[in-house]
Amino acid sequence: MRIAVSGGGTGGHIYPALAFIKEVQRRHPDVEFLYIGTENGLEKKIVERENIPFRAIEITGFKRKLSFENVKTVMRFLKGVKKSKSYLKEFKPDAVIGTGGYVCGPVVYAAAKMGIPTIIHEQNSLPGITNKFLSKYVNKVAICFEEAKSHFPAEKVVFTGNPRASEVVSIKTGRSLTEFGLKDNQKTVLIFGGSRGAAPINRAVIDMQEELKTRPYQVLYITGEVHYEKVTAELKGGKAADNMVTKPFLHQMPEYLQSIDVIVARAGATTIAEITALGIPSVLIPSPYVTANHQEVNAKALSQHDAAIVLKETELSGEKLIAALDKIVMNEETLKDMSERTKSLGVPDAAARLYSIMEDIKK
């Protein structure tokens, strides 16, 4: 069996693709994969690290206003389609899966026009331009939020959830927080502003550090590598709380999530998939800098079920953040109830569901 995969730009498009690849490899050890992305994108480094064959096309995203740059983007798209067709003719895949980001546009479009069975996977509640365009041509559209359904042809839509969920629940033995000098037997909050960090979240944490010193819970705080030196300097200036450990980045984060009681994070699709799969209550701070404000819609999908507290970035402060944490962590009943509600929204078998759709369209 041969499968071509495309998706990139951000980890939110790449990690679901890798989780799906692992699921297929588990079922078919002799499967062959080809990943098509961009030369300069995040996907190249991540995919090649996993020893998956990688081919590149040149493509950029559309600007959301009329510009000459969009004319060039159309030209790159057409060139990308031509290049993708040559890769696909050579590889001869049984199916092609696109996981979003503009890079998968030419690849999946080319595959559909060649009559190869195709699926797109939409991680967010509000779909991006690329997947909306591709939905007219593909066999199936896999979604992670019911809110996304209305944006696609109804007869093509299948709810699968995000394969990243399957990956985090498959980790049987998590790693100990004692690696960071934290206690294994104490309630723990993970604060994480995304791979690049988030300055407004960092400011709120700095502002709440004095209050945090009096709390019976501990914090593992990931600043993002760009912000680490500045943040740690400010924290030390305020004599950082003993019950908080600060790190620039956390590699293999899923391996630590089983030891976390509450998470403070953005509301990206991958984060939502991970916390719902494991039943981790959350304080979500949606990024206002994303397309169509989709993170706010992602967050609402949890908060409307009382599975998360949502704080808007414009209203964020140290006082509000620690109050939200106290509300969850300091009340055992609330913590348990939110954990159950969060877990009820998870789809731990998402990768298997996506695999099943692929098998169906191949027939």
Swiss-Prot record:
Disulfide bonding pattern of the chain: none
Gene3D superfamilies in the record: Glycogen Phosphorylase B
Binding, UDP-N-acetyl-alpha-D-glucosamine: 10-12, 124, 195, 295
Coiled coil: none
Topology in membrane: Peripheral membrane protein
Pathway(s): Cell wall biogenesis; peptidoglycan biosynthesis
Enzyme superclass (EC): transferase
Enzyme Commission numbers on file: 2.4.1.227
Pfam families xrefs: Glyco_tran_28_C, Glyco_transf_28
Matches recorded under HAMAP family: MurG
Official protein name in the record: UDP-N-acetylglucosamine--N-acetylmuramyl-(pentapeptide) pyrophosphoryl-undecaprenol N-acetylglucosamine transferase
Gene from which the chain derives: murG
